[in-house]
Amino acid sequence: MHTPPALPRRFQGGGRVRTPGSHRQGKDNLERELSGGCAPDFLPQAQDSNHFIMESLFCESSGDSSLEKEFLGAPVGPSVSTPNSQHSSPSRSLSANSIKVEMYSDEESSRLLGPDERLLDKDDSVIVEDSLSEPLGYCDGSGPEPHSPGGIRLPNGKLKCDVCGMVCIGPNVLMVHKRSHTGERPFHCNQCGASFTQKGNLLRHIKLHSGEKPFKCPFCNYACRRRDALTGHLRTHSVSSPTVGKPYKCNYCGRSYKQQSTLEEHKERCHNYLQSLSTDAQALTGQPGDEIRDLEMVPDSMLHPSTERPTFIDRLANSLTKRKRSTPQKFVGEKQMRFSLSDLPYDVNASGGYEKDVELVAHHGLEPGFGGSLAFVGTEHLRPLRLPPTNCISELTPVISSVYTQMQPIPSRLELPGSREAGEGPEDLGDGGPLLYRARGSLTDPGASPSNGCQDSTDTESNHEDRIGGVVSLPQGPPPQPPPTIVVGRHSPAYAKEDPKPQEGLLRGTPGPSKEVLRVVGESGEPVKAFKCEHCRILFLDHVMFTIHMGCHGFRDPFECNICGYHSQDRYEFSSHIVRGEHKVG
């Protein structure tokens, strides 16, 4: 190794700095000093080598500099300097041992450098002592790149964690990963004290305190804190639609869906549903002379077709309840068709009406004759009864009423509505308006089939749903006095087989113009009032007992216990349940 005999500059040193390609200023100054002719054969060797390791620290200024105080740790001898930071005593020279310049090849340099130092830079980056680097594990993006926390360099250039073996793409990723082992969270929120391992997470957290939502939708007022949330929101605007989030809309009913496939499935069902409504309406309007039945659930827009889209279709998209998407929306419209007395095929006022207005038991105190059944039920549980078809009986009280002293014959065959929409409770019955009930059919129909009579218990529900009638208005006011007899109509021959012997002498009366009648008489031969439950096929001579019994039948299902809700299969099971009194309420 060649060492220059003397240098025109004085070097003082106590520290050791390795500069494998940086500190360009010190290197240039050294080359400038050596280019004075002292060692002409040294510079080519210096230029060809990759690294210089100097034993002394180059000093440019006189006095105690900051670098000398920080790194040398000892006072430096006096020196004379000029304003251009060059020494004025070139006669002073250093001995051969005062400065030592060593040159190594690439292989020797890589052997001398530790594995941690080789991880930082591949190009000629600065490698300084640990005292010059920033604190480990903190990076705010403003200073130089932090020192790598350590790892194993793989042949593909990636770093491997020496704790768990996780492979990271670079030193920064490895540094953040090592914080999961050390538990270090250098980024802290000044407002709530939350700490984070990365600065980006802290910045996103600060937006929670400020309420800032920097990502805004250009099409609507939607704003969010994260970019990925905005990206998902923008997909809703891919197809222009007034319904945000559901861009696929049905042309028939206006309902919107998120996916095209779901819309296609719905349109097929919705179109078939509307076609069925149209077919039913055409069949109904084509037979104006038939009996008035099956008239409900027909919207006005179907009765009066027009070229425009029906107005009721807009209501299909505004369903009030949740339902499966596979079920087409149901029309929600007028539940009752109202008719005046002139539209009915028979005269309601022919033989009188009620003695007084129909009223609920809740309006009166319970009499002792009612027994324990109604007392157990309570007046709050009393509802309008679902009475049997009146083809078999012409006089039935349509609601649970108070004890009548006299019962009036009802010439029209009436029944309470089968749904709650028709009005129930005292507020619907006592407001002064006409009472609405459904008519079964024409009284004067001479061709009534015997099957329209008292049906068996197994087909009670289906027959009730099949026979849907219109709505009639009952007159109010005191009607004339009734005749002393009660006429019970019969149509079913099977009923006569079940009861071959009439109770207390059932005398066959003269058949009327359109049906056979039975008259109940007592032992002395005088007529006796009788009340019949069509569901259980039981005759009651006392109206109070009949009312109590009818109160046990359910509103929607006649074989559902109105006390506890128990469902029976037939009238025998229902009667057994009522007799045993096994009611489990709640």
From Swiss-Prot:
Primary location: nucleus
Protein name, UniProt field: Zinc finger protein Eos
GO cellular component: nuclear body; protein-containing complex
PROSITE patterns named in the record: ZINC_FINGER_C2H2_1, ZINC_FINGER_C2H2_2
Organism of derivation: Mus musculus (Mouse)
Chain intervals with Polar residues compositional bias: 79-98
Location in chain, cross-link Glycyl lysine isopeptide (Lys-Gly) (interchain with G-Cter in SUMO2): 100, 501
Positions of region (Interaction with FOXP3): 281-586
Note in the entry: Eos is a Greek word for rising sun.
Modified residues (Phosphoserine): 105
Keyword Glycoprotein: no
Keywords: Acetylation, DNA-binding, Isopeptide bond, Metal-binding, Nucleus, Phosphoprotein, Repeat, Repressor, Transcription, Transcription regulation, Ubl conjugation, Zinc, Zinc-finger
Lineage: Eukaryota, Metazoa, Chordata, Craniata, Vertebrata
GO biological process, one term: positive regulation of transcription by RNA polymerase II
Record's compositionally biased regions (Basic and acidic residues): 25-34
Segments of skewed composition (Pro residues): 476-485
Short motif CTBP-binding motif PEDLG, span: 423-433
Domain of life: Eukaryota
Record Pfam families: zf-C2H2
Family indicated by similarity: Belongs to the Ikaros C2H2-type zinc-finger protein family.
Subcellular location per the Swiss-Prot or TrEMBL entry: Nucleus
InterPro entries to which the protein is assigned, alphabetical: Ikaros_C2H2-ZF (IPR050589), Znf_C2H2_sf (IPR036236), Znf_C2H2_type (IPR013087)
